[in-house]
Every structure is written in C-alpha cells, then in structure tokens.
C-alpha cells in the first residue's frame, strides 16, 4: 500500500519509517521544503528524530502532488493547529477522495472540533476518515519496539480492512467504531498526565 504522510515531525517520521520498514511505500510531505531536502540528503530527520535512517522505500517530497501520486491512504500527522490547512490542501490538490487518518491529538482551537470532525467539515463527502491514537512514542516506534494503538472510524468495514493492512509484528492496531471516544481520549490524556 502507498501511504502519504503529511507532516515531518518526530511522530510523522516515526510512522513513515515504521510503515516503510514493513513493506509499504511511503511518501512524506511537509510545508518546510528546506527541512525535507535535508532529510532526503541526510537520509535522516536530524531536526525531530535524529539517529534513525530513512528506509529506501520512504521518500520526502516538497511537491504535494508528487507525494500524493498513487497514494491509497493519507495520514495527517501535523499539529492540530495545522490540520485544517493540511486537509484543505488535500482538497485543493484533488485528493479529497482519499482515505484520511489523523494521527494528531487535540481539539481545534477556534472551533473546539476533534481532529476527525475537522476532516469531515473540509471533506464532507469522504466516508473513509479515521483517527490513530494510543500509548505510543516516536522514538520507541522508530526503534521498532512493540506498541498497540487504536484505529477508529465510523466506517467499520473500512477500518477493519485498514487494521488488517497496517498491522505489523511491531505495531498492533485495534479497530474501534467509537471514533469520538478515541479522539477525546487522545485529546485529554496529555492534560491528565500532567
């Protein structure tokens, strides 16, 4: 499966490395073209996830169309503040029909919406919207240490298909249709942890 990851921070890079190591073709895109060029040249995200080599099946693009070409799934791994703009860009680039999974946690500041609700508002006809959440850390996933996370969506057949496609010996995904509960749990857990 070809996965496009929007966002080149620590978590986006860790997910990209993980899926690339487990037989997926992965393309990353972020707004900062200079950062992506450095990642391509150094084969590493020295700014946000130093010490982890980018696999050969992972490419970093400053051109969103190139990153989306042939994509079967888009994972938006930005801050919640950057989520709406990223999804708007997907729509503008003709990719609003692609399945979208958010891997960021929180509520949109201006609207109070959860991440999947922001995606639904921007892409109202998209029926394949999900949330990835759970107790996981970028460095641990990049080291290929085991983790378990939830992949939630209101679309049960699709989410079950995605769990089958994305499960690996390292990352165990559990399907859940309580997307509100999963998104709220992810959003408030950091507050409770503090």
Q: Where are each of the predicted segments found?
A:
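Short, conserved active-site loop motifs that form the nucleotide-linked donor/cofactor pocket
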Residues: 57-59, 171
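Internal alpha-helical scaffold of NAD(P)-dependent oxidoreductase catalytic cores
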Residues: 82, 93, 118, 122-126, ...
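NAD(P)+-binding Rossmann beta1-loop-alpha1 motif at the extreme N-terminus of oxidoreductases
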Residues: 1-52, 60-62
């Amino acid at each position: 499966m070809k996965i496009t990851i929007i966002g080149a921070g620590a978590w986006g890079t860790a997910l990209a490395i993980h899926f690339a190591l487990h037989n997926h073709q992965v393309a990353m895109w972020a707004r900062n073209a200079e950062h992506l060029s450095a990642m391509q040249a150094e084969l590493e995200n020295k700014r946000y996830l130093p010490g982890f080599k980018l696999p050969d099946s992972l490419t970093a693009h400053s051109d969103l169309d190139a990153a989306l070409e042939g994509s079967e799934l888009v994972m938006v791994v930005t801050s919640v503040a950057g989520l709406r703009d990223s999804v708007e860009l997907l729509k503008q680039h003709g990719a609003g029909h692609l399945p979208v999974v958010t891997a960021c946690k929180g509520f949109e500041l201006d609207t109070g919406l959860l991440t999947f609700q922001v995606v639904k508002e921007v892409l109202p006809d998209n029926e394949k919207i999900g949330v990835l959440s759970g107790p996981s850390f970028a460095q641990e996933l990049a080291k290929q240490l085991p983790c378990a996370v939830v992949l939630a969506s209101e679309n049960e057949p699709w989410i079950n298909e995605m769990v089958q496609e994305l499960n690996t010996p390292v990352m165990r995904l559990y399907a859940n249709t309580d997307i509100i509960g999963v998104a709220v749990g992810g959003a408030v857990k950091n507050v409770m942890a503090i």
